[in-house]
Amino acid sequence: METVNGKGQILDGHIFIYSADEEELDPHDLLSFMRRNIQYAKDYKHNMQMYLGNHDILNQQRRMYGPDNRLVANLPHYIVDTYNGFFTGIPPKITLDDKNENEALQQWNDTNSFQDKLSEISKQTDIYGRSFAFIYQDENADTCIAYASPTDAFMVYDDTVARKPFAFVRYWKDTESGLWTGMVYYANKIKTFKGSIVEDSDQNNMYNLVPAVEFYGNEERQGVFDNVKTLIDELDRVLSQKANQVEYFDNAYLKILGLDLDEDGDGRPDANLIGNQMIYSPNADAANADVEFISKPDGDNMQEHIIDRLVSMIYQVSMVANLNDEAFAGNSSGVALQYKLLPMRNMAANKERKFTQALRKLYRIVFSADQVVKDKDAWQDLLFDFKQNLPIDISEEADTLQKLSGVVSKETAFRNSRLIDDPKKEIERMQKEKQEEINQALQHSASATDQMLMDDQKENDKEIVGFRKNGESDDEEE
């Protein structure tokens, strides 16, 4: 723990704490927190550069001689995208039991592209270790959501046991004055600052809550590849060194001993090898000459071994599965593959719990604006359903649904199936289809009844006509 100007503290994981007895951040404490976050931003930006493929080896001093290859094994990009796709590749289902409230919720989510923003928040969490979502009102007074990276934003919590949000800070550098400028969001007001000067005027905060939430996958606020950065750097170095050696020995040296090739007597060998497949000398001593290429040291097996070991350790320590591994290409059983994915699934389950808490806090802010749903306390009734993005065995999923039929409710069964995105809508569709079938059956039944009545009427008419004809014949005979 580190103290900042006496009132503020910084805990492990770059967590900022401030006294709950204060109404707002002291300007000096605000600047101290901001300077410290700018310092931490160097690590955040370094992680982003690694994700983008700009690794440290590319910035090292150039060699004065020999090959100087700089190879980058961009495993951070693979690890982040694989894990984020596994976690949010299937958008989580966020629903309410009340039909009208749920429709309003889904409408707000769709209007704000919430699932896309949530995926980006998850991605930033994997890269930086944390990300922020904040709520605001646009020019039409509609409730909207945006996200911010920790490179230019941070959250300050109070020093109580609950660690409630005290303030959310966004900042940027003013291009004209060159001063750091930003906004501080409190639960009851919003203040603007430029440099060390905080404006006296306040903007109203209609939410009565700090309008931002921090997302993270673990309490330590570590990114998904933070623990393997040194291994990745070493892999880059080994691959580059191997490429240098291959290029160096491609320029093979020819050793010629005991052979006089100085034809013009200038003391230099005259060996024209271009286009020739032989070396000829009329000297009788040439029979004992030694002509061969200098062979390179055979360190290839050792290099391949350390490369394989580094790659294996990177996936093992990061706990993200290597989907290109032979284990996923063979005919392994489903249980065996589940064990291969177990570390990543455990990590995703922990991240799911953290995200569920953060999402509930976020929707509490959204619902407090009284625009999305009528019940401001509906955030307590939200249902979150995260599904890990795994290949779907349709036959197995169908069998599971069939086995659950009659054992649990349809909604519960549908929630446990990856074939169905929205259980409530699926139930509504099934009920609608069933009602349509009933209506069609009734129509067919009514049509059949009418047809039978018409047929009976025709038969009756025929009988009446026949009776009349018979009566007329009897009269004529009389």
What residue ranges belong to the model's regions?
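A short, surface-exposed helix-loop junction/capping segment
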Residues: 102-105, 290-292, 341
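Conserved aromatic-histidine-acidic binding/catalytic patches
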Residues: 53, 67, 71, 88, ...
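C-terminal helix-loop subdomains that flank or include functional centers
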Residues: 270, 277-284, 302, 309-478
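Extended, regular secondary-structure scaffolds
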Residues: 122, 126, 132-221
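Short amphipathic alpha-helical segments
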Residues: 100-101, 109-117, 125, 227, ...
